[in-house]
């Protein structure tokens, strides 16, 4: 049996980007995190301590998004590193960061990066 916990649509305002204006003005971001785990015992026992607490996942995302970076790729890697080091029981992890209305030439709704893979 495969179990997934998803924390999707985490809306944040942050100051990432290579342009000076982005450091001053900031922009809107949406982060999605999907975690594969085994929550059989948590489901049987109704026990939060036997599964991944999505409050912790949300906190990690918010803390890392608050640290300015030029690249959302860098932010995504920091989120990945913290989740795999701080949350037990992971089998697979996927993180997507969407930068809404990026300041690039053209009419673009969003740009995004995804980091996904197995966790040992």
Q: What does each model-identified segment do?
A:
Residues 1-120:
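N-terminal, polar/charged subdomain of small-to-medium soluble alpha/beta proteins
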